[in-house]
A protein has these predicted regions:
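Cofactor- and metal-binding active-site motifs of prokaryotic enzymes
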Residues: 3-136
Length: 136
């Protein structure tokens, strides 16, 4: 039987890795490779070797979409597990909205995550959306 199809949204994921030691140049390189200016959100896994102040400032200056970033002991790069550098992932879709929340210190993370999830569920109920759509 002939069935009408409805177009679905496409999720585009781009991955990049840099070993550039200068935070500003590393973030600029990743932003270009990830096409971050058009992304719905960006995830960054950063080596603890970067000074966090300059790294955070470079991210805020360069990537103007929501970013979730963390330090990591190592990242999966083009050559497998690597130490140093930054690995990034950009996600782009008309159906995706990313809302980062600071979880600090991490020992408070669980209770903060529960509070955030409850607030998102409350907002979803108020706007008659499913919680999964809001949390996604």
């Amino acid at each position: 039987p002939n069935m009408a199809t409805t177009p679905t949204s496409t999720l585009v994921a781009r991955r990049a890795h840099t070993q550039e030691p200068d935070a500003a140049r590393a973030v600029a390189e990743l932003a270009a490779e990830l096409e971050a200016k058009d992304a719905s959100g960006v995830l960054l896994f950063c080596s603890g070797e970067y000074a966090l102040g300059p790294l955070g400032a470079a991210i805020a200056r360069t990537i103007r979409v929501p970013v979730a970033a963390c330090t990591a002991a190592g990242q999966l790069g083009p050559n497998g597990f690597e130490h140093g550098g930054i690995t990034g992932l950009s996600l782009t879709s008309t159906d995706l909205e990313m809302r980062p929340h600071l979880l600090s210190p991490l020992t408070l993370g669980q209770s903060q995550a529960v509070s955030i999830a409850r607030e998102q569920a409350r907002r979803a109920a108020a706007s008659r959306q499913s919680p999964e759509a809001v949390l996604a």
